[in-house]
Curated annotation (Swiss-Prot):
Residues noted as binding [2Fe-2S] cluster in the record, renumbered to the chain: 122, 195
Cofactor comment: Binds 1 [2Fe-2S] cluster per subunit. This cluster acts as a Lewis acid cofactor.
Protein name: Dihydroxy-acid dehydratase
Residues that coordinate or bind Mg(2+): 81, 123-124, 491
Modified residues (N6-carboxylysine): 124
Task of the protein: Functions in the biosynthesis of branched-chain amino acids. Catalyzes the dehydration of (2R,3R)-2,3-dihydroxy-3-methylpentanoate (2,3-dihydroxy-3-methylvalerate) into 2-oxo-3-methylpentanoate (2-oxo-3-methylvalerate) and of (2R)-2,3-dihydroxy-3-methylbutanoate (2,3-dihydroxyisovalerate) into 2-oxo-3-methylbutanoate (2-oxoisovalerate), the penultimate precursor to L-isoleucine and L-valine, respectively.
Pathway where this protein functions: Amino-acid biosynthesis; L-isoleucine biosynthesis; L-isoleucine from 2-oxobutanoate: step 3/4; Amino-acid biosynthesis; L-valine biosynthesis; L-valine from pyruvate: step 3/4
Organism: Yersinia pseudotuberculosis serotype I (strain IP32953)
EC number: 4.2.1.9
Length: 616
């Protein structure tokens, strides 16, 4: 029988000092036999996805206490990728994921907590907490802050849905008036919550449902809706039961590595491909798998991407549907239901409720369930009122979207395409693979050949795009922006946004060893591995070299002879210590970022630390 970790600090005369300090936090004699559960919050006023979380940790903590546990809350950092975008702040975004994972480990191990409830929401916070959960392997339940309501505004006598990306595109479009740009900006992000499309934050919160570590509804139920409060209450209640299952019944199925096992990781990736999730999810799933010592790699993702259809199309791939519409159609469980009926899921998986996949679908799939309470939960909709408060409205749709032929979620037979929303490409320029969000690629661009326009940084590329130096047919190559070369693997949202604003969104391709925002669409290929700073072939591309992109056949090739590439490599390596570094780039890199770069792996490994350099 496993021993409660917390007994290390609460039992025995030699722990009198520790107990004295615990008493100073409000604990009493009766508490020293109870499980100590960490409430890992991420409240900050910097991030709209986290601005409403201040009191939600207390909500979870009170429920833990009522259920027989001891709750201890602490906070992690949280970076807003949208606010950090387009300047030096973006260098810190991905490295913050590692800091979040480490800080959770430090706090939980230093104080010997028995279990965790992770209150996350935005881009790097959910992955960082997920990495920590699988690293620590103690009982955990995730509950996120929830999605933002879609923005809405009236243009040309028509109400349209908006999000952050619309504000960015129109703000950079010289043909849009100042008045219209300001109207879109003021309407794009109306409430607290993670940005309203299938961007990185919402993608990851959906994947946590598929992994089994979050409660049904977690990925899609709006941050503003009163129904979301129940998820926080349930998380506080169920974590105590989950903790006792492990420590008092020796039930190892309660541990995250046994819930989020390889079969669950495959299901999560299948979901991601089917819903056209952010390419960043690939990076984060690979990183989490490494933390959990789960054998899940780019090879698995490539295999899955070839058989999974695109069943759910959401902004930024379409303006019609946002997360509130996904929820109305049945949310994550609704998509999983269609995937299961298509015979694509691993069924021998469980979740934090102790339910297997069949039981979960019977209870929560709107196409199967007889539970009116569940149907009411999925009818929870937006109020259209600007607010930063959680649970501030209780509006409901008059009916659910169960149209599986032309609705938000489709059956396999009526899929948006039989090819999924994400693809892994291989070729000489990406020997270890690269990622493209096919859900956002125009059908006419699935194959593309063009001359390279090479840039040593995102900033240089942006200047060229806005300066008219990039023309239709070009392949924009942005290198030395990978985990090591950036450092920090910046998101390339501004280059893709500006290509659209300059009318080049469907006539150019973009290739980078950096990554893309979940808000990116178009022929944008990222995560090129190995990256330039690690000697990847992308570092040898020259202006005018032709690059062939073939998404249907999963290929990407630099059309340059092996002899010429060998000569270029020899020339590059002759630079000695200056080899495989950007030429002429001026960038201030802090020592904190240099420390990250020293240990960072390329994107095909999840950009995690190279443990071999640490003796691991």
């Amino acid at each position: 029988m496993p021993k409660y970790r917390s007994h290390t600090t609460t039992h025995g005369r030699n722990m009198a000092g520790a107990r004295a300090l615990w008493r100073a936090t409000g604990m009493t004699d009766d508490d020293f036999g109870k499980p100590i559960i960490a409430v890992v919050n991420s409240f900050t006023q910097f991030v709209p996805g986290h601005v409403h979380l201040r009191d939600l940790g207390k909500l979870v903590a009170e429920q833990i206490v009522a259920s027989g546990g001891v709750a201890k809350e602490f906070n992690t950092i949280a970076v807003d990728d949208g606010i950090a975008m387009g300047h030096g702040g973006m260098l810190y975004s991905l490295p913050s994921r590692e800091l979040i994972a480490d800080s959770v480990e430090y706090m939980v191990n230093a104080h010997c907590a028995d279990a965790m409830v992770c209150i996350s929401n935005c881009d790097k916070i959910t992955p960082g907490m997920l990495m920590a959960s699988l690293r620590l392997n103690i009982p955990v339940i995730f509950v996120s802050g929830g999605p933002m309501e879609a923005g809405k505004t009236k243009l040309s006598d028509k109400i349209i849905k908006l999000d952050l990306i619309d504000a960015m595109i129109q703000g950079a479009n010289p043909n849009v008036s100042d008045e219209e740009s300001a109207q879109i900006e003021r309407s794009a992000c109306p409430t607290c919550g993670s940005c309203s499309g299938m961007f990185t934050a919402n993608s990851m919160n959906c994947l946590n449902e598929a992994l089994g570590l979050a409660l049904p509804g977690n990925g899609s139920l709006l941050a503003t809706h009163a129904d979301r409060k129940q998820l926080f209450l349930d998380a506080g209640k169920y974590i105590v039961a989950l903790t006792k299952r492990y420590y008092e019944q020796d039930d190892v199925s309660a541990l995250p590595r046994n819930i989020a096992n390889k079969a669950a990781f495959e299901n999560a990736m299948i979901l991601d491909i089917a819903m056209g999730g952010s390419t960043n999810t690939v990076l984060h799933l690979l990183a989490a798998a490494q933390e959990g010592e789960i054998d899940f790699s780019m090879t698995d993702i490539d295999r899955l991407s070839r058989k999974v259809p695109h069943l759910c199309k959401v902004a930024p791939s379409t303006q019609k549907y946002h997360m509130e519409d996904v929820h109305r159609a049945g949310g994550v469980i609704g998509i999983l239901g269609e995937l299961d009926r298509a015979g694509l899921l691993n069924r021998d998986v469980s979740n934090v409720l102790g339910l297997n996949l069949t039981q979960t679908l019977e209870a929560y799939d709107v196409m199967l369930t007889q539970d009116e309470g569940v149907k009411q939960m999925y009818a929870a909709g937006p109020a259209g009122i600007r607010t930063t408060k959680a649970f501030s409205q209780d509006c409901r749709y008059p009916s659910l979207d169960t149209d599986r032929e032309e609705g938000c979620i489709r059956t396999r037979e009526h899929a948006y395409s039989q090819d999924g929303g994400l693809a892994v490409l291989y070729g000489n320029i990406a020997a270890d693979g690269c990622i493209v969000k096919t859900a956002g690629v125009d059908k006419d661009s699935l194959t593309f050949r063009g001359p390279a326009k090479v840039f040593e940084s995102q900033d240089e590329a942006v200047e060229a795009i806005l300066g008219g130096k990039v023309v239709a047919g070009d392949v924009v190559v942005i290198r030395y922006e990978g985990p090591k070369g950036g450092p920090g693997m910046q998101e390339m949202l501004y280059p893709t946004t500006y290509l659209k604003s300059m009318g080049l969104g469907k006539s150019c391709a973009l290739l980078t060893d950096g990554r893309f925002s979940g808000g990116t669409s178009g022929l944008s290929i990222g995560h090129v591995s190995p990256e330039a700073a690690s000697g990847g072939l992308i570092g040898l591309v020259q202006d005018g070299d032709f690059i062939n992109i073939d998404i249907p056949n999963r290929g990407i090739v630099l059309d340059v002879s092996e002899a010429e590439l060998a000569a270029r490599r020899e020339t590059e390596e002759a630079h000695g210590d200056a080899a495989w570094s950007p030429k002429g780039r001026e960038r201030q890199v802090s020592y904190a970022l240099r420390a990250y770069a020293m240990l960072a792996t390329s994107a095909d490994k999840g950009a995690v630390r190279d443990k071999s350099k640490l003796g691991g």
